[in-house]
Amino acid sequence: LWEMTDEWKYTRNYGRGQFRTDQARYYKAEKDFQVDLNGDGTIGYKLKNIESKGNKKLFQDNINGFHVRDEKGALHEIIRGSKKVKANATWQLKAAERVGGFDLVLDQNVKTKNFYLWEMTNKWKFTRNYGRGQYRTDQARYYKAEKDFKVDLNGDGTIGYKLKNIE
């Protein structure tokens, strides 16, 4: 990006050097100029739907950041510690929903299937862990969260307790 005078004469490079497709500022420039710079058919982030069962929809963008679309259609980046939350090899965001009057995000360990619930502001900024620490697959509250978020977190094919016929 170049900074120009009112007479459209070059003054200097704008920003901090080259804008790359793996940087959030690249996609901000696409939105600011309303142009698809990388030819992916989308202006701004290309979003993949992660979960869309309730009033809140969870998306992951093409540089691994997470976003929530609220019931009014507004898209919010999920922020923790002033940084955009990104996926990693161990932890993945699985769902976002309003439960019991709180906006919550479910952050799951991909190996153990245990998870934390994050309490968020209405702008989807992390405030604190919700509840009493990590939710484990041997706890009733784990299965309540499956029902609250309408997702099968442990991969058993059932939302909530898996019941066995004993008769």
Annotate each PLM feature.
Residues 1-167:
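Long, low-complexity, Gly/Thr
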